[in-house]
Amino acid sequence: MARVMTAQIRQYTTPIDTSVPDSKRKYIPSSGTYPRGFRVSGTHVGVKPSNTTFPDLALISSDEPCSAAAVFTTNRFQAAPVQVSKQILEAREGRGIRGVVVNAGCANAVTGKGGLEDAKSMSAKVDECNGLNSTGGQGDSSTLVMSTGVIGQRLPIQKILSGIPTGYSNLSSTHAAWLKTARAICTTDTFPKLVSQTFTLPSSPDRTYHIAGMTKGAGMIHPNMATLLGIICTDAPIAPSALQSLLTHAVSRSFNSISIDGDTSTNDTVALLANGAAGGQPISSPTSPEYTAMQSILTGFAQSLAQLVVRDGEGATKFVTVRVQNSPSHSDAKLIASTIARSPLVKTALYGKDANWGRILCAAGYTQGLSPGTLVPERTSVSFKPVDGSAELKLVVNGEPEVVDEERAAAILQDEDLEIVVDLGGGNQGEAAKGGEDALYWFCDFSHEYVTINGDYRT
């Protein structure tokens, strides 16, 4: 039977409201609660010549200096803004950061010394707007830089430098401003990705803190850190010494636990800024209740942002969670989960609504780098967990195939959301390791549209 194709229209940058696919509108917040002392703006400067309307320059600014931390791409061809932002954070030891400037439409990657100078000039221009005299990229710079878009092209730097003062003059703390800023960092995304929430900490349960973040990404996503950008801001007081470890833990279990196409970009960056504007005692000790609480809050928040990236995967029709459980270690469970998430055969089977569990086991079986005895075939089980809360559909139990109700399997695969559970049964430790470590990974399927989008990307 012929498959009926419904194309999603992908623009260079996030389209106006009327172009957001109906299925994605529910992910765009109509309101938000934002951290004190942060203001943001999204401005059109026309980084890409074909963009004549949409905002493509984002500014995130704190009224007071922030503690800051970031996690960057592991790609050896690190883009100029990655190198410059690393340099700024190292020189300042995570202190005194005032904000972030982001352009969409050009990655400023593999652009040589000129690209580095462009990134530094973006940082210096924002500092100038803040009344600071900096050279960009040195110890006196206080603005981090991010870029996303096509690799190997120089920035239209004069357009950007001319647009920064306009963006600075339009800084605002309103929901509309945050949403427009989230739009400004997008490329092939079909919707802006913005999340905000309030929280409390054990030492001051009556004090309300805020956290807000935006992210972009729809393709070239298999972070360690892909083109994936994330900016998270909070008004909680967090010492620089604690901020990096908090972010690293959160990213490991969120942005580094998603995959769309298995590619890792030159530009990936997730930054966390904390200005302490809500008051209270700074979080500093990793053994304190405040640190433990903040770690849980930040990790859950980062997962919410990262999952939006998967939901907007290029050409995606499925949002899939793979849970590997009862593993002797978290790292081994994550290796297996990531291998399944990257498998083109698994992803295409899910697009075709085919309950082909053999592809899942095959991917698990060729996972590289596992500790000896982690994966024992006769202890391994696979099931589908429906989103409606009904009983799991068992596909394989302790290495033995189950008689599968194909009609129920087909019904489960009709839903957009699916959870695949791979139970290792404790590996060669058996019952002793049951109740052991779990890992979650989020990914999407591969469709015909993914090929179409990426075949046309530069145009």
From Swiss-Prot:
Principal place of residence: mitochondrion
Sites annotated Involved in the stabilization of negative charge on the oxyanion by the formation of the oxyanion hole: T148, G149
GO BP, sorted A to Z: L-arginine biosynthetic process; ornithine biosynthetic process
Posttranslational mods: The alpha and beta chains are autoproteolytically processed from a single precursor protein within the mitochondrion.
Claim: Mitochondrion is one of the keywords in the record: yes
EC number(s) reported in the record: 2.3.1.35, 2.3.1.1
Entries under CDD domains matching the protein: OAT (cd02152)
InterPro entries: Arg_biosynth_ArgJ (IPR002813), ArgJ-like_dom_sf (IPR016117), ArgJ_beta_C (IPR042195)
Self-association state and partner proteins as the record states: Heterodimer of an alpha and a beta chain.
Natural source organism: Uncinocarpus reesii (strain UAMH 1704)
Protein name: Arginine biosynthesis bifunctional protein ArgJ, mitochondrial
A cellular component term, taken from the record's GO annotations: mitochondrial matrix
Biological role stated in the UniProt entry: Catalyzes two activities which are involved in the cyclic version of arginine biosynthesis: the synthesis of acetylglutamate from glutamate and acetyl-CoA, and of ornithine by transacetylation between acetylornithine and glutamate.
Catalytic residues of the enzyme: T227
Pfam families, per database record: ArgJ
Keywords linked to the UniProt accession: Acyltransferase, Amino-acid biosynthesis, Arginine biosynthesis, Autocatalytic cleavage, Mitochondrion, Multifunctional enzyme, Transferase
